[in-house]
């Protein structure tokens, strides 16, 4: 497995090992613990042999029929990244001291891997990794054979998971047909199914992200009034987004709630600047924040920058809110 992986990377494969958020739930399905999944050697071994199986099946599919008219088959396609997107990512990465080389596709892959390796264990790891993945082209399914850029494979398909992915089931059906000397399947019909599968994959990924976000907010709602270390993950004219480093959950500090100064947004430097203090807060800065609110249904987390004034005012308001809630619940019990 290690030899297979080494061979892939020599050919220009890119390693995108994201930090996957997981939860432990109680008997009422409420999150009682949030943790980052650790990929072990056993996971990587299985992954490499699944990649090998998928590649070999794709190679077999591409060998069916005559060179000028191959039999219909389903491939997993990943195109080269858009150069404009790469340049924008380079500007983003430069804020953290990283750089991507553009001389060739192998140079891009090599510098991407070097960047991702150097991020390991750093506060900005999740932020930069996520942005790097968004820079890449979206993989999709199709009947026209094309390379898989991210894996550096000339032929690739999805074959190993027919119980959870419809394209794998399509591949199994095509294999069964061709192994029994069947004629080529209708290409237009399979191309349409590939487009539908690609569209549904995007929807499924969106739903998964939303569900993780929901549980993150639900979990963070138990930490109202507590302080956390974070990293500035976005800057806008209405506020700054901060990723809570411990839980990989993003919240917002609104400019209207920043009481120490009046801040102006500088789009060029992706920062906000205090008019009186000239204090600058920019993308990638490490800061300490206080959780002030969490709305599960809107999936939003409200934060405030930590200073003594903010803490005093928040704690005073929070104590009043707790007393109001206790008084309200007492009235309900008496009824």
Descriptions of predicted regions:
Residues 310-314:
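C-terminal edge strands of extracellular/lumenal beta-sandwich accessory domains
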Residues 223-226, 262-289:
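Short nucleic-acid-contacting surface segments enriched for D/E, G, S/T with interspersed K/R
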Residues 1-259, 284, 290, 295, ...:
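Electropositive polyanion-binding surfaces
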């Amino acid at each position: 497995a290690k030899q297979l992986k080494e061979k892939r990377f020599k050919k220009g494969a890119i390693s995108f090992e994201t930090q996957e958020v997981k939860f432990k739930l109680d008997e009422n399905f409420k999150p009682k613990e949030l943790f980052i999944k650790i990929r072990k050697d056993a996971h990587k071994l299985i992954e490499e042999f699944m990649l090998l199986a998928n590649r070999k099946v794709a190679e077999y599919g591409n060998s069916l029929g005559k060179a000028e008219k191959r039999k219909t088959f389903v491939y997993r396609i990943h195109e080269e990244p858009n150069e404009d997107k790469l340049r924008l990512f380079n500007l983003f990465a430069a804020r953290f001291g990283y750089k991507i080389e553009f001389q060739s596709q192998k140079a891009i892959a090599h510098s991407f891997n070097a960047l991702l390796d150097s991020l390991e264990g750093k506060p900005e790891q999740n932020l930069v990794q996520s942005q790097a993945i968004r820079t890449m082209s979206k993989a999709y399914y199709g009947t026209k054979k094309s390379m898989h850029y991210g894996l550096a494979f000339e032929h690739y398909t999805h074959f190993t998971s027919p119980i959870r992915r419809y394209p794998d089931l399509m591949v199994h059906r095509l294999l069964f047909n061709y192994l029994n000397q069947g004629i080529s399947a209708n290409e237009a019909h399979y191309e349409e199914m590939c487009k539908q599968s690609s569209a549904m994959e995007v929807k499924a990924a969106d739903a998964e992200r939303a569900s993780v976000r929901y549980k993150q907010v639900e979990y963070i709602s138990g930490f109202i009034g507590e302080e956390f270390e974070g990293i500035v993950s976005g800057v806008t004219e209405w506020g700054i987004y901060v990723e809570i480093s411990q839980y990989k959950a993003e919240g917002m500090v609104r400019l209207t709630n920043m009481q120490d100064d009046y801040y102006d947004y500088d789009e060029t430097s992706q920062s906000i600047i205090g008019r009186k203090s000239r204090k600058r807060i920019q993308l990638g800065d490490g800061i300490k924040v206080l959780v002030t609110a969490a709305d599960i249904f809107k999936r939003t987390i409200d934060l405030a920058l930590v200073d003594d004034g903010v803490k005093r005012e928040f704690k005073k308001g929070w104590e009043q809110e707790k007393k109001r809630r206790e008084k309200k619940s007492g009235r309900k019990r008496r009824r």
